[in-house]
Amino acid sequence: MSDNIYSVSQLNSAARQMLEGNFSQIWLTGEISNFTQPVSGHWYLTLKDENAQVRCAMFRMKNLRVAFRPQNGMQVLVRANVSLYEPRGDYQLIIDSMHPAGEGLLQQQFEALKMKLAAEGLFAQNLKKTLPHFSKAVGIITSSTGAALQDILHILARRDPSLKVVIYPTAVQGKEATAEIVQMIELANARQEVDVLIVGRGGGSLEDLWCFNEEEVARAIFRSTLPIISAVGHETDVTIADFVADLRAPTPSAAAELVSRNQDELLQQLRHQQQRLDMAFDRLFTRKSQRLKQLALRLQNQHPQNQLRAQQAKNEQLTHRLQLAILRQFENTQQKFTALSVRLKQNPLPYRIQRYQQGLEQLKVRLNFCVNRQVTERQNKLATLCGKLDGLSPLKVLARGYSIAENPQGKAIVSVKDVNQGDFITTQVADGKIVSKVL
């Protein structure tokens, strides 16, 4: 007897792990029988051939992507994982995708090409070209007689009538379609007359849409310098062109929406931007006007004539203060002299008189010295101030080439607004006056 003794549960679990590990994602073809769909939405069926059968399950999230309704007796191609339902020990398939048997080979080719191009980097997001924000011209590569073209043109005309449209007619089904689509993509890139290309058609079966799964079309889309939007079939239809294109639109109508801008929305945006621009201009104008007024006031306060008047007033104040200081110094000295004279007269002693007389003579000498020194200092300071005053004299300013214009009332003209046409004005220059008439 073997040393390993399994329970039924252990055996079923080990068998399930072995099956799932060795039979993952296999392709299987067979005939449907015993098809059921309970309220859960899952599909349960049996796949069989003339010699055997196997139970299958396809869960609701997977079967929602199947484009047809399975029927008993239908031949299908499925991709599935082999598993085992442990509670009953039933061996079964968990189906991932299902196609009619006629489409099975095409689906296998689709998956193989998809893996090949993905490995080469044709689907890389960092290589996708950005669509222009505002398209000026759009190219449409599709059938000239198909409903997809009419849908695109109708939406473009409604949303953006000014948008230029260039149609590159081509077959979108049949043997010639692949070569013609490639030719039109290359033609559009050579002419460079549009900003973006829409490549697509309306809905159809897998065989009808197969030209958009061809490798030649995929590589032409990848080589294009113009951004390309793929718009093939309905939202549930997925092609190789969708993966390679710079952007996928679920329908041709959706592609038209992507490349056009609604004029009403644009006008609303323009009005909003205009309002913002007007508000910004008003704020700027107000700020600059206030600054101009401040500069005009500063210029008026710093006018040479105003500065001259202020300096003259300051010089007059200094001169008056100097005169008062000299007068007070003289009066103080005179008072001291008088007091000493009185004291001398009141003292009868001759030697005291003589001593006071000597002191008086000394005081006279000191007084004369102090007075002369004070007078000299004040005269020097006065001369300095007079020199500065003379430097600010209007005549000196005029001698340097400046002039002062006055209106008939004798008021200085500081602005063109201070005179009117026909007024006589007087212009003071260094050596005289000039009378002029405003024209």
Swiss-Prot record:
Compartments, as annotated in UniProt: Cytoplasm
Keywords: Cytoplasm, Exonuclease, Hydrolase, Nuclease
A Gene Ontology term for the protein's cellular component: exodeoxyribonuclease VII complex
Enzyme class: hydrolase
E.C. numbers: 3.1.11.6
CDD domains, per database record: ExoVII_LU_OBF
Reaction catalyzed: Exonucleolytic cleavage in either 5'- to 3'- or 3'- to 5'-direction to yield nucleoside 5'-phosphates
Keyword Hydrolase: yes
Main location class: cytoplasm
One GO process term, biological-process aspect: DNA catabolic process
UniProt-recorded Gene Ontology molecular function terms: exodeoxyribonuclease VII activity; nucleic acid binding
Residue spans crossing the bilayer: none
Family, similarity comment: Belongs to the XseA family.
Assembly and interaction partners: Heterooligomer composed of large and small subunits.
PANTHER family attached to this UniProt entry: EXODEOXYRIBONUCLEASE 7 LARGE SUBUNIT
Role according to the record: Bidirectionally degrades single-stranded DNA into large acid-insoluble oligonucleotides, which are then degraded further into small acid-soluble oligonucleotides.
Protein name (record): Exodeoxyribonuclease 7 large subunit
Species for this entry: Haemophilus influenzae (strain 86-028NP)
